[in-house]
UniProtKB/Swiss-Prot annotation:
Membrane-topology annotation of the record: Single-pass type I membrane protein
Stretches of the chain found on the membrane's Extracellular side: 26-169
Modified residues (Phosphoserine): S211, S238, S267
Organism from which the protein derives: Mus musculus (Mouse)
Segment forming the signal sequence: 1-25
Designated gene of the protein: Lrrc25
Residue ranges of coiled coil: none
One of the record's GO cellular component terms: membrane
Keyword vocabulary terms for this entry: Cytoplasm, Glycoprotein, Leucine-rich repeat, Membrane, Phosphoprotein, Repeat, Signal, Transmembrane, Transmembrane helix
Protein name: Leucine-rich repeat-containing protein 25
Function: Plays a role in the inhibition of RLR-mediated type I interferon signaling pathway by targeting RIGI for autophagic degradation. Interacts specifically with ISG15-associated RIGI to promote interaction between RIGI and the autophagic cargo receptor p62/SQSTM1 to mediate RIGI degradation via selective autophagy. Plays also a role in the inhibition of NF-kappa-B signaling pathway and inflammatory response by promoting the degradation of p65/RELA.
Length: 297
């Protein structure tokens, strides 16, 4: 009988220890507060559960100086304002699972004794970077949103969250873009200038290669007429006309009797032969003798 009683006592002791361990592992599980929460009131409990109430956190401190566990899960929170946690000096565990957190205030990250239970998300990157400064920091974990299984936060951030573009990266990108634009515009400007110079040099070279016959001669204002009259008295000089006169053969009056078109071709030309009166640029009248019949050949 004594041995049976001893076994029963040991069994009861083991069950009691198991219950104590289970209660300790639940992190002071407490009752959920009603949906309407007055943030101005004072909360004296050590465990505050505001889970699933669809709350938004105010920018003023929560009056709960004795709280050790704070459950804010399933509220659709995106930001944890640092001012809300200013007076929670005894807070040890903060539960924010099932919230789409974009960022966590740096004041919470600097509290090295605070345990944060949150879903794995890229919003924890800044919090993780600051927590690396805590001495004796254990491995930081996050919970899978679906299975709530713990995962290594460092591994999750490296695999799932690419490094964000900080001010230095953005500045370098802007500077590189500006440099590229300046280089492209400079190249286009240099190409246009080189093209203009090449055209100018080609034009000068083509001018230099032109023969004297290709160069157009200037047209004088005065162009004399040809006539078949004998030289007469010199006409008075008159200013040159601005209009260009056409060349033409002008025959005035009847040809002289001794100026026969059928004269012998080999006879020497005399003073009475037909001639043309040519007036040069200097207005000098000069006779030009010719045999018109031979000229017609």
């Amino acid at each position: 009988m004594g041995s049976i009683r001893t076994r029963l006592l040991w069994l009861c002791l083991l069950m009691l220890l198991a219950l104590l361990h289970k209660s300790g592992s639940q992190d002071l599980t407490c009752m959920v507060h009603p949906s309407r929460v007055d943030w101005t009131q004072t909360f004296n409990g050590t465990c505050l559960n505001f889970s699933g109430l669809g709350l938004s956190l105010p920018r003023s401190p929560l009056q709960a100086s004795h709280a050790q566990v704070l459950d804010l899960s399933k509220n659709g929170l995106q930001v944890l304002p640092g001012a809300f946690f200013d007076k929670l000096e005894k807070l040890q565990t903060l539960i924010v699972t099932h919230n789409q957190l974009d960022s966590v205030d740096r004041s919470l990250a600097l509290r090295c004794d605070l345990e944060l239970k949150a879903d794995c998300s890229c919003g924890l990157a800044s919090w993780y970077a600051l927590r690396q400064n805590c001495s004796g920091q254990q491995q930081l974990l996050c919970l899978h949103p679906a299975t709530e299984a713990p995962r290594n936060l460092s591994t999750f951030l490296q695999v799932s969250c690419p490094p964000s573009w900080g001010p230095g990266t953005i500045g370098a990108l802007v500077a590189g873009t500006i440099s590229l634009a300046v280089a492209v515009s400079g190249s286009v400007l240099a190409w246009r200038l080189l093209r203009r110079r090449r055209r100018a040099s080609e034009h000068s070279l083509s001018k230099a290669q032109m023969s004297p016959h290709d160069i157009p001669k200037p047209v004088t204002d005065f162009l004399p007429r040809y006539s078949s009259r004998r030289p007469g008295p010199k006409a008075p000089d008159s200013p040159p006309s601005r209009f260009t006169m056409d060349y033409e053969n002008v025959f005035i009056g009847q040809p002289a009797e001794d100026c026969s078109w059928s004269a012998a071709r080999n006879s020497p030309s005399g003073d009475s032969d037909c001639y043309m009166n040519y007036r040069s640029v200097d207005q000098d009248s000069q006779p030009v003798y010719c045999n018109l019949e031979s000229l017609g050949r």
